[in-house]
């Protein structure tokens, strides 16, 4: 922040004082500029003279007539990078993503935003929602008296908000403190409004820690559909347990017709786990999923084949909630010709990125590395395009069908 101190000292020397609004604008600008200078993966961010960028944009911040104008100037500065995952989100939007709820308590439902509606796509069998008769395909209209539609419409209208953030905003409104209750109003299968008061119990899975992040519940499930193996886990975390479970699932499937790995809604986690899991699926040594470029290091996602490798067809299921390590895993195996990808385009958020709040209250997102898949594709801002695009629909869920899973099962059946 040395430039902020310099300019404020200079202003004081010449008898110029700044209003609190202007001080906030300057502090926010300096936060953005300094962060890019210090944390971008390129020493010259975007190939630019970043010092010259400061000299160009700082006077414009001083002359900005409003907070909106100052934010527009900062966005223009970030636009010079011509790189994704660098953005400023208005405080109101940032707050909408964070929500007012949140907590470790869940009514036991999973949801996705389908065609602008919050649709129930999963139910925990013993959850309060299941006991209350909630069904797949029901639409969640409101939580504790607050409609969800206005929030979704507002977030979807902001081009900087991707599906991952949208799902996060919904999730925060459908959770709360363990032991409490939440009132949800649904649209049932007959399009009738029904209200349910649901108990909030601990979210599915086991608590896992990663770095300085708060504990997060990680679950892993494995089952078979006929002779096709199926695994699903919600995050690439809890390394020892999840890797062990994945290995056991693959090991129990040596005679399976195929294997389905469901990464829908999986926001990623530890990148190295993608390499480890791929080792159970790729038998050739020295294969790579891709390469990550950081300021002081380059990380090759090299696959080390296991002693026993599953050789059958592999299908990976993805959607707009699949991000980071999920994208690295899916695109890497797709590029190597080892897996076929089903679903909808992923979050296009493969890079390690950080959200911070600026002094003016706005949200600031920035990336700290670049990633190129083995096929030469930059996933950031582009995402993984499925080999077979299939969308979940409310109608299908009400009828008991998961169209994405069904498509993968049909493909494996035809490969027999």
What is each residue range found by the language model?
Residues 32, 77, 109, 129, ...:
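Terminal peptide-recognition signature
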Residues 129-161, 260-264, 333-336, 341, ...:
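Conserved PDZ fold ligand-binding element
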Residues 175-359, 370, 397, 411-416:
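Cleft-lining beta-strand/loop regions that shape enzyme active-site pockets
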Residues 63, 69, 136-183, 247, ...:
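PDZ domains, with a preference for the canonical peptide-binding region formed by the helix
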Residues 44-116, 178-183, 187-221:
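Extended, small/polar residue-biased N-terminal targeting/export presequences
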Residues 100-150, 238-239, 369-370:
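PDZ/PDZ-like domain segments forming the peptide/carboxylate-binding groove
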Residues 15-17:
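Boundary at the C-terminal end of the N-terminal hydrophobic targeting segment
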Residues 19-48:
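Mature N-terminal segment immediately following signal peptide/propeptide cleavage
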């Amino acid at each position: 922040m040395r430039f902020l101190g310099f300019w404020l000292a200079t202003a004081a020397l010449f008898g110029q004082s700044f209003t609190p609004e202007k001080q906030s604008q300057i502090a926010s600008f300096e936060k953005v500029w300094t962060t890019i200078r210090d944390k971008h993966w390129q020493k010259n961010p975007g190939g630019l003279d970043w010092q010259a960028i400061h000299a160009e944009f700082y006077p414009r911040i001083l002359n900005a007539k409003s907070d909106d104008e100052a934010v527009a100037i900062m966005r223009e500065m970030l636009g010079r990078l011509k790189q994704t995952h660098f953005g400023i989100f208005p405080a109101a939007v940032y707050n909408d993503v964070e929500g007012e709820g949140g907590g470790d308590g869940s009514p036991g439902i999973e949801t996705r935003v389908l065609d602008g509606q919050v649709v129930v796509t999963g139910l925990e069998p013993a959850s309060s929602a299941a006991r209350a008769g909630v069904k797949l395909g029901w639409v969640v209209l409101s939580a504790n008296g607050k409609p969800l539609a206005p929030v979704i419409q507002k977030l979807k209208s902001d081009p900087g908000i991707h599906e991952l953030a949208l799902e996060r905003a919904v999730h925060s409104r459908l959770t709360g403190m363990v032991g409490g209750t939440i009132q949800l109003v649904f649209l049932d299968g007959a399009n009738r409004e029904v209200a349910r008061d649901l108990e909030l119990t601990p979210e599915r899975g086991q608590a896992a820690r990663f770095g300085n992040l708060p504990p997060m519940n990680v679950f892993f499930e494995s089952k078979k559909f006929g002779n096709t193996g199926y695994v699903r886990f919600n995050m690439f975390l809890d390394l020892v347990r999840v890797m062990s479970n994945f290995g056991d699932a693959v090991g129990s499937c040596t005679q399976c017709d195929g294997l389905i790995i469901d990464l829908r809604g999986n926001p990623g986690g530890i990148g190295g786990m993608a390499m480890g899991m791929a080792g159970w699926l790729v038998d050739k040594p020295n294969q790579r999923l891709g390469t990550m470029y950081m300021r002081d290091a380059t990380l090759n996602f090299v696959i080390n084949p296991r002693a026993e490798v599953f050789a059958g067809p592999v299908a990976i299921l993805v959607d707009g909630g699949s991000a980071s390590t999920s994208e690295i895993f899916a695109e890497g195996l797709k590029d190597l010709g080892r897996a076929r990808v089903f679903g909808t385009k992923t979050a296009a958020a493969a890079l390690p990125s950080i959200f911070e709040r600026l002094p003016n209250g706005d949200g600031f997102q920035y990336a700290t590395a670049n990633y190129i898949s083995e096929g030469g594709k930059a996933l950031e801002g582009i995402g993984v395009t499925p080999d077979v695009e299939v969308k979940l629909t409310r109608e299908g869920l009400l009828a008991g069908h998961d169209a994405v899973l069904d498509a993968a099962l049909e493909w494996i059946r035809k490969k027999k």
